């Protein structure tokens, strides 16, 4: 494939939650443009399957690591291993998260609120912060540039009953990204949020459930369909 302006060869991209769904969509975009990809996710079998797909798509190098981003200790150790293997980091996609589980705020136990934010907000923040730390060090050594990307949601703009944990994490990380864009712009490090709508991923449930969702809600969108992970190829690159 002709890469042109989107040539990712020689660049190293980290995708958290990159072994499936939207995260794998981001990673595939980088792989198709020849970039190196690091995946952080907890499931070793899914990591291995994702690695095979990314290598087949044309990635330069692919490494997967079992990292739980709810743990700052694991994030820091993950970066140590990534830097030992690749020697640099050029792009971070903070994508790890989960689907919301409740239909009313009164059904949401307080501990589940904290558990959700530990991954989708606190984990994303620490992942982006530590990735930026490496990028800034590289910039100060004479090689500026980098990209920080958070996976947001249309819940940034529209309220949803019972989805306070999900929406709060997305709004919080969007605010973090805006601050990072201002702080790190002088190093030519970009910071952006991608805000998907309804995307059919394995978290939606079985094939029958996914088809019901696609058939019910797809016609209500301007393009007449829901989204799929492969729609994120171009965004990833």
Regions found by a protein language model. Give the residues of each.
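Alpha-helical segment proximal to the catalytic Tyr-Lys
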Residues: 133, 182-186
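Active-site loop-to-helix junction immediately N-terminal to the catalytic Tyr of the SDR YXXXK motif
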Residues: 108, 158-167, 179
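Conserved glycine-rich cofactor-binding loop
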Residues: 19-21
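Substrate-binding pocket helix/loop in short-chain dehydrogenase/reductase
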Residues: 103-105, 112-117, 213, 217
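Active-site helix of classical SDR
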Residues: 128, 169, 177
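Residue(s) in the substrate-gating loop at a strand-loop-helix junction
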Residues: 153
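C-terminal helical subdomain
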Residues: 193, 215-237
């Amino acid at each position: 494939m002709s890469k042109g302006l989107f040539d990712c060869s020689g660049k190293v991209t980290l995708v958290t939650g990159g072994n499936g769904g939207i995260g794998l969509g981001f990673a595939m975009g980088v792989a198709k443009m020849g970039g190196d990809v690091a995946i952080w996710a907890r499931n070793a079998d899914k990591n291995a399957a994702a690695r095979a797909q990314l290598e087949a798509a044309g990635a330069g190098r692919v490494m997967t690591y079992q990292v739980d981003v709810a743990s700052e200790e694991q994030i820091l150790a993950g970066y140590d291993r990534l830097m030992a293997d690749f020697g640099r980091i050029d792009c971070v996609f903070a994508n790890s998260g989960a689907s919301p589980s409740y239909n009313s705020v009164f059904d949401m136990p307080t501990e589940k609120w904290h558990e959700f934010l530990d991954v989708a907000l606190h984990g994303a923040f620490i992942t982006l912060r530590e990735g930026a730390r490496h990028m800034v060090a590289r910039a100060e050594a004479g090689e500026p540039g980098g990209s920080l990307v958070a996976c947001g949601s249309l819940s940034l703009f529209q309220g949803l009953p019972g989805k306070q944990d999900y929406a709060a994490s997305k709004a919080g990380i969007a605010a973090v990204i805006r601050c990072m864009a201002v702080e790190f712009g002088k190093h030519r490090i970009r910071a952006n949020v991608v805000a998907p709508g309804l995307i059919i991923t394995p978290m939606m449930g079985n094939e029958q459930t996914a088809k019901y969702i696609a058939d019910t809600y797809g016609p209500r969108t301007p393009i007449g369909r829901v989204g799929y992970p492969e729609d994120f190829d171009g965004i990833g690159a």
